[in-house]
Regions:
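Alpha/beta enzyme core
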Residues: 2-41, 45, 53-58, 62-73, ...
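Short hydrophobic "strand-cap" motifs at the C-terminus of beta-strands
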Residues: 194
Length: 232
């Protein structure tokens, strides 16, 4: 088990987590439970779809737990204007963070100028309203060169985070991808790992590889595992 098991506290580990509920079948009760769990465990953020932002904003107001909206999710196949509108509306409704999916078609077509315009537009709407911007690559569909190209665009534009995955693609976060992204962006941009992170060991490995945020729907389970091991 990682050395982090002994250096992290319950509180510091909890702050890595964006506690996630993005299922199309999620009920209002599910969203309320997500917020309640995040308050109880002091997670950094709840990750939800834009339609859930007003409810989460009301439930979490003044708590310090951020509300994060997923934009262009999960396919990224929206126009720049649609993504900007969704991000702006989500922020107006109370979101403090935006996780948006890139246009993967543009990347596969090597239309880097489009991707830079898209990223700049999303970063701008977030900056204007004081929100954090995270860029989801969806690495399971990308080659190494494509991942590196997106990191270079991010370095030019300056979002707050680059993120591995939606959790809805054919694969989630991998240690190799987190390491690649961290090598490319260094300390200038943070890395978020998401997708398939369901155990404490997996989460700690992602943190050791360079992730500064973890997106997971298993955050409560992971934190509970940490607490049990620290007591043994």
């Amino acid at each position: 088990m990682s050395e982090l098991l002994h250096t992290l506290t319950r509180e510091s580990l909890a702050q890595y987590f964006d506690h996630t509920q993005l299922a199309a079948s999620a009920t209002e009760a599910d969203i309320e439970a997500l917020c309640r769990e995040s308050l109880e465990n002091r997670f950094k953020m709840v990750a939800i779809n834009p339609v859930q932002v007003p409810l989460c904003s009301r439930l979490l107001h003044g708590s310090g737990v951020h509300v994060g909206a997923a934009v262009g999710f999960p396919l990224g196949q929206n126009t720049i204007e649609e993504k900007v509108f969704s991000a702006g509306q989500s922020i107006e409704n109370g979101a403090q963070e935006i996780d948006y999916v890139i246009n993967i078609t543009a990347l596969k077509s090597k239309d880097y100028a489009y991707l830079e315009r898209e990223m700049a537009a999303l970063v701008a709407v977030c900056r204007e309203q004081g929100a954090i911007c995270k860029v989801i690559f969806e690495n399971c569909y990308l080659t190494g060169d494509e991942k590196r190209a997106m990191c270079e665009i991010a370095l030019a534009v300056g979002p707050d985070f680059v993120k591995t995955s939606t959790g809805f693609g054919s694969g989630g976060a991998t240690l190799d991808d987190v390491r690649l992204m961290k090598r490319q962006v260094g300390d200038k941009i943070k890395v978020k790992a998401a997708g398939g992170i369901r155990t404490l060991d997996s989460a700690l490995q992602m943190i050791e590889a360079g992730a500064e945020r973890i997106g997971s729907s298993a955050s409560v389970k992971i934190l509970g595992e940490f607490c049990r091991l620290r007591q043994e």
